[in-house]
Amino acid sequence: MLRNIPRSLRKDGGKRIPGLISRVANQFSTTSSLLNKKSIPDAPEDSHTGQYINTITKPFTVTTYARPNVVMTHGKGSYLYDLENRQYLDFSAGIAVTCLGHSHSKITEIISDQAATLMHCSNLYHNLYAGELANKLVTNTINSGGMKEAQRVFLCNSGTEANEAALKFARKYGKSFSDDKYEMITFKNSFHGRTMGALSVTPNEKYQKPFAPLVPGVKIAEPNDISSVEKLISKEKTCAVIIEPIQGEGGVNAIDAEFLVSLKKLCVDNEVVLIYDEIQCGLGRSGKLWAHCNLPEEAHPDILTMAKALGNGFPIGAVMVSDKIEKVLKVGDHGTTYGGNPLGSKIGSYVVDQVSDKEFLLEVEEKSEKFTKGLSKIANKHPDHIGEVKGKGLLLGLQLKGNLDVGDVVAKCRENGLLVISAGMNVLRIVPALNIPNEAIEEGLDVLDKCIDELSKDPKSSFSQS
């Protein structure tokens, strides 16, 4: 067992760190039970984990995250394992990313084979897989009943990068009418990213205030209130409206279909680009290929952004545009060095095949029903502490209330081998792998039930060690 992390690591330029990490990873096995039976509080400062974090991680990484004393070392399917050989059932999937689970065998094979063949060649040249991925995205989207005017795809590396591209494309479309047509409308409780353009349409003071002033011309409307949009939209000035069909970070809020139909009509009447951000709710997460597949064609977007699940953990994003957007874009208007690289594109192509499959999507809906029934049962047991079950598919939330704090629930669940995350105003968010086994759903719900039961009796209690 690793007893100490040498002080000399800081004096040798980090040359010995890779070897240390390798030794640490190799000395722990995955022989623990399906879910640990005992409480597993976060590792103390003098543990292997504490030493690693305080000696290697914290001194050399920017302080932008508040993280518990947990160092993940490996994962398989719906389970993660840490440096202390603790096992966790993952109901978070890396924030709705690992849609096919951790260390998926086929994706591992694709990564290995393609890395040995060609990882990157830039967009100065074509490669074998970028066009294939774009073709599959457009074809499967139309065949699934989504974005009826889907035409072309821009490949990039992340969700915020996809939204930046979408906003640029919308600005270019607006300028084809007038230089004054540059304003954008976003919605309360939305989240579109942290780079400057995406941040500007993410109306959360916590994220925006430290970096103001932001991109000018952004108006904020109320979701599900079409009159609030009518007051802001202008044929002369507005170029884009951006919205998540199901808000994730903002609280797992599904937007009403009637509102989205009316919103699209407003956009058409005012020659405004409608952007759907399906970075979290898309690619099978809602039980359909896209969340907007549940909507009539009259509510379909002009631009669709995606990322997260597209690479199952490998960084990749994409922007799908209609013909009217494609027509205003010229060579040199936008670009990316890494976007559409052969490795990411080949992974994305495989993921799209899986999440477009009708049987796969039916199973997502069945798992959603199982989750919803279980969560409703928990909610009914605790009417003073749980309001409603929110969301669609496997993007679900529990609205907490009373003295039950979502941070306490997240910590309590983690201590008992279950990973969940928060969203919005005191909402517990559940976004597991789309292929999570039914028995894992049941076991995770049992842990969640016990944790909420104990916290509802004593919000600051510790889960039983027995």
Swiss-Prot record:
The modification N6-(pyridoxal phosphate)lysine is found at residue 308. It is found in: Mitochondrion matrix. Pathway: Amino-acid biosynthesis; L-arginine biosynthesis; N(2)-acetyl-L-ornithine from L-glutamate: step 4/4. InterPro entries: AcOrn/SuccOrn_fam, Aminotrans_3, Aminotrans_3_PPA_site, Class-III_PLP-dep_AT, PyrdxlP-dep_Trfase, PyrdxlP-dep_Trfase_major, PyrdxlP-dep_Trfase_small. Its main location: mitochondrion. It catalyses: N(2)-acetyl-L-ornithine + 2-oxoglutarate = N-acetyl-L-glutamate 5-semialdehyde + L-glutamate. One of its GO terms (molecular function) is identical protein binding. CDD domains: OAT_like. Its EC number is 2.6.1.11. Its cofactor is pyridoxal 5'-phosphate. GO terms for cellular component: mitochondrial matrix. Disulfide bonds: none annotated. Keywords: Amino-acid biosynthesis, Aminotransferase, Arginine biosynthesis, Mitochondrion, Pyridoxal phosphate, Transferase, Transit peptide. GO terms for biological process: arginine biosynthetic process via ornithine; L-arginine biosynthetic process. Belongs to the class-III pyridoxal-phosphate-dependent aminotransferase family. PANTHER family: ACETYLORNITHINE AMINOTRANSFERASE, MITOCHONDRIAL, AMINOTRANSFERASE CLASS III. This is Acetylornithine aminotransferase, mitochondrial. The gene is ARG8.
